[in-house]
């Protein structure tokens, strides 16, 4: 069965989609512990833009709190804790930055 063009086009468009992200990718400084689950489902922008010079980019974000189990492999102790993850709420096709171009204002280190 052939999927109609409009369906194919709409499904591939730039939009927030459920995406699995690794907790260690989001929290790289927490490598000494094990997390269960090791990844979480969050909404992130992805999809195709009408032009190769454009990139699917988040224009709206919010934070979600998720309950995760943290396991300390040295002591074999575990505890439930709330961790924060960024979800994308709105996406747009925006011009890609040229290599070497600054990313914009940098956050000040804490």
Swiss-Prot record:
Disulfide bonds: 14-56, 45-91, 49-93
Protein location: Secreted
Modification sites for Pyrrolidone carboxylic acid: 1
Pfam families per UniProt: PDGF (PF00341)
A molecular function GO annotation: vascular endothelial growth factor receptor binding
GO biological process terms held by the UniProt record: induction of positive chemotaxis; positive regulation of angiogenesis; positive regulation of endothelial cell proliferation; positive regulation of mast cell chemotaxis; response to hypoxia; sprouting angiogenesis; vascular endothelial growth factor receptor signaling pathway; vascular endothelial growth factor signaling pathway
Recorded superkingdom: Eukaryota
Keywords recorded for this protein, A-Z: Disulfide bond, Growth factor, Pyrrolidone carboxylic acid, Secreted, Toxin
Tissue: Expressed by the venom gland.
Transferase found in the keyword field: no
Homology family: Belongs to the PDGF/VEGF growth factor family. Snake venom VEGF subfamily.
Name listed for the protein in its UniProt record: Snake venom vascular endothelial growth factor toxin
Species of origin: Daboia palaestinae
């Amino acid at each position: 069965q052939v999927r109609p063009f409009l369906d194919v086009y709409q499904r591939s468009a730039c939009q927030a989609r459920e995406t699995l992200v690794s907790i260690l990718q989001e929290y790289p400084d927490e490598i000494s512990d094990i997390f269960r689950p090791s990844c979480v489902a969050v909404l992130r922008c992805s999809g195709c833009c009408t032009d190769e010079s454009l990139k699917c980019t988040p224009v709206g974000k919010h934070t979600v709190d998720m309950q995760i189990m943290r396991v300390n492999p040295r002591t074999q102790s575990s505890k439930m804790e709330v961790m924060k993850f960024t979800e994308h709420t709105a996406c747009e096709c925006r011009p890609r930055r040229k290599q070497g171009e600054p990313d914009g204002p940098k956050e000040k280190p804490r």
